[in-house]
Amino acid sequence: MSAGRLWSSLLLLLPLFCSKSSSCGLSTHVEIGHRALEFLRLQDGRINYKELILEHQDAYQAGTVFPDAFYPSICKRGKYHDVSERTHWTPFLNASIHYIRENYPLPWEKDTEKLVAFLFGITSHMVADLSWHNLGFLRTMGAIDFYNSYSDAHSAGDFGGDVLSQFEFNFNYLSRRWYVPVRDLLRIYDNLYGRKVITKDVLVDCTYLQFLEMHGEMFAVSKLYSTYSTKSPFLVEQFQDYFLGGLDDMAFWSTNIYRLTSFMLENGTSDCNLPENPLFISCDGRNHTLSGSKVQKNDFHRNLTMFISRDIRKNLNYTERGVFYSTGSWARPESVTFMYQTLERNLRLMLAGSSQKNLNHVSSPSASYTLSVPYARLGWVMTSADLNQDGHGDLVVGAPGYSHPGRFQIGRVYIIYGNDLGLPPIDLDLNKEGILEGFQPSGRFGSALAVLDFNQDGLPDLAVGAPSVGSGQLTYNGSVYVYYGSQQGRLSSSPNVTISCKDTYCNLGWTLLATDADGDGRHDLVISSPFAPGGRKQKGIVATFYSHPRRNDKELLTLEEADWKVNGEEDFSWFGYSLHGVTVANRSLLLIGSPTWKNVSRMARSSHKKNQEEKSLGKVYGYFLPNRQSTITISGDKAMGKLGTSLSSGYVRVNGTLTQVLLVGAPTHDDVSKMAFLTMTLHQGGATRMYELAPEKTQPALLSTFSGDRRFSRFGSVLHLTDLDDDGLDEIIMAAPLRITDVTSGLLGGEDGRVYIYNGMYTTLGDMTGKCKSWMTPCPEEKAQYVLTSPEASSRFGSSLVSVRSKGRNQVVVAAGRSSWGARLSGALHVYSFSSD
């Protein structure tokens, strides 16, 4: 078959294979398996399983997708649906372990090694599906974006995850051939069922369809990014990071099942507890406190059929125990993928060459800091303070995804000390700088940071959030650790105070803030978790612990001991997603964002259950502490806008008048773009509102608005005000971390990101980005004093940012959360220096 004919066949096959079938998720499962292997270390036993799997990637990758092979109707009209269903549960793993131990004693030959690698891939799929389908991700996605419809989220999420994977991640590790241990699988199924339930031809045909689909996804699936981004902002924002069922959480659970599988392969199952749900397997005498449930993961099928033509079968190579699938010439570099990449490069060069250089663009940072550890999430959160009391600002950076071999996502915090020149003006690998390291498996230490004097000894202390502590028990309670400062300017090497939460899925420490909560003029510790139950489901919790000199060393506190605590008002409203403290007329005002608030009370009065105008409006609450009743409320007015995702405040001149302002981000707000006489909707382009904080007014008055200029850019998802030119006014800094450079928003390019800096002297009333000299609106660049552009494509430049002040200069540090400069998706920090000239 020619490359063109096969390419056409793949385009036809993809929608048939994926539409409304839970057999999709091939790219997602392959990516999970790849990440799980990165930090795998199984110390006990006679076999180096990591080396074995690395040697047999062809079998391992095929195994990560295999359990879904027989679900879709395209596979023999769905006749073997039950075979796929049974492959997802512990009895299949148990049968496989016994089969290998009975038939293939150590040392193993190569075919048996491939069988073992294939089995490891299957176990990854098992536990990943449970987190994705049954426990966490899709259920929350349904609640947030699909009116509590799990089935709608399921339909969009399975294939949408593949679209997002292909758009955001580089699959250059994908093996060009796969191996399926056909003979061994047939015998395992015979043992599992006690009879013959499937034939060799069915097994080969249906797994080969998976192989073709996986490589078909590599060609064109990423071009559907805009479709699935529009359907579900939650999918785009939480796909990798969500605490229960996000990619990294599924990779963590894969490493757990690998440890158990290796133990059973070498020692048998007699010392193991094997419930039907593989998440609850244990071989150490301990079991999880949660009870497992078996939920059938497939609900949708079509009566479709397809056969594999004879001329495609020439890419199958049978062996005594299995079959190899290969791509042939159609997937080589000169294929469609290569043509897409070449077209993208040429268009980028053409656009760059034809456009006049913008004088306000800053494309080169003064320094960049990286890590050589993949998936570290460097710069997930940052703060600055003079920790060593030398008069210079220091930079504190969280990397909650940092891992060691055998210690997945324990997390780290890095401290970079400033001097007369500010932060070090050279590129750094931060592993050589000051470090605090987490100690709980997948605890994600470093997810939140706050600097305050918690024990009031005159020295700055550091609070660090680890919201996924307890993930190994499926409780995700979370913890906050406080490290006391010392006279030597260094922090304690171990936490002096630990604050914990007893509620399942509490996620304590997701956000931290230092602000004066009791009116004594000293900062106190504010802790929030938008995912905490709050009495029901993800209402969110915000709590405050006052700083005082009676704080003891090695103190253990619980959330119930908080001095001040407030819950969200609606399920899945994510109260506490953002926090900001500000002083207004000598009173402490705590602002709390609830971006997925949807006005349930008004929805209940509506005659339409699915009122499109009520979803994720967002809301901001303002509390004059220590009052527990909100005095200020600001509500969103646009469905899916998520007002309150970000908050910041400062002083600027508005039409020449000095004004204390509050900025509120709505990064998934839709806007209208005008291009000459044409108009189009900028879905999730993002907007920011600027309000006046006036002591004589009960509610803040809206002054100005800012809007992004690209679809899906999330303009305003990060906000910051700081005085960069020492004129007594704050500059307004806004980030659009998902901004795609080309106007097609997904057909070419990736999530590059961009940061805009507006001079605080020149803000005006009304639409700041709508009055444009150019032929296109909005125009966020025109009024900006500086536009920081990403030095790396597809890096989510602007995922977080912070300002650092020293005696000699003011600096802005911008994180690129998906940078691969140091290692794959490890993150990077870029430093920009500004003077008062």
Swiss-Prot record:
Glycans are attached at residues 94, 267, 287, 303, 317, 477, 496, 586, 599, 655. Widely expressed. It is found in: Secreted. Its main location: secreted. Its EC number is 3.1.4.50. GO terms for biological process: cell migration involved in sprouting angiogenesis; cellular response to cholesterol; cellular response to insulin stimulus; cellular response to pH; cellular response to triglyceride; cellular response to xenobiotic stimulus; chondrocyte differentiation; complement receptor mediated signaling pathway. Keywords: Glycoprotein, HDL, Hydrolase, Lipid metabolism, Repeat, Secreted, Signal. This protein hydrolyzes the inositol phosphate linkage in proteins anchored by phosphatidylinositol glycans (GPI-anchor) thus releasing these proteins from the membrane. This is Phosphatidylinositol-glycan-specific phospholipase D. It comes from Mus musculus (Mouse).
